[in-house]
C-alpha cells in the first residue's frame, strides 16, 4: 500500500461526506409578524446556525448573504442543487419556503432533507402538501440544538457509511 493510495482513498471518502447545507426559511419582520413571532424566528435562525457551525458545515442562508446585488432566484436554485443537506424551517408555512422545498424535492434525496416546524397562533400545523415528509415538531428553538442536531448528525453518519 502506497501513501498516495491512502491519500486518494481519504479524498474519495471526504468527497462524499456532506459539507454544504441550504437553509430554507422565512425572513421575519417585527413590524409585519409581531414582536413575539419575530423573536421566535430569530431564535430558530440563531439555533440552526449554531448547530451547523458546531458540525463544521457550510451554511447557505440567503437572508444573510453579503455579496451585494444578485438574482436571488438563480443563487437559490443553484445552491439547492449543490447542497448536501437541505434544511427547511416550515414554521409559518411561508410561500418562499414551500417553493424551495418543492424545488429541493426534485434535486435532493429526501434522506438528506430535514424539516422542523414551530406552531404559532397564525399557523398551527404543517401544510397538507408537506405533512407526509419527515419533520421535527418543536416547541422552542432550544430543540434545534438537541433533536434537530441529532438528526443532522444521523445524516452525516449515514453519508460517511455510504448508506445515503
Go through each PLM region and give its residues.
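Cross-kingdom TIR/SEFIR domain
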Residues: 92-155
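TIR-domain catalytic/interaction hotspot
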Residues: 64-89, 93-100, 106
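Extended, non-globular alpha-helical segments
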Residues: 44-81, 127-164
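Residue-level preference for short coil/turn positions at secondary-structure junctions
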Residues: 17-19, 81-82, 109, 131
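Conserved N-terminal substructure of TIR/SEFIR domains
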Residues: 1-68, 77-80
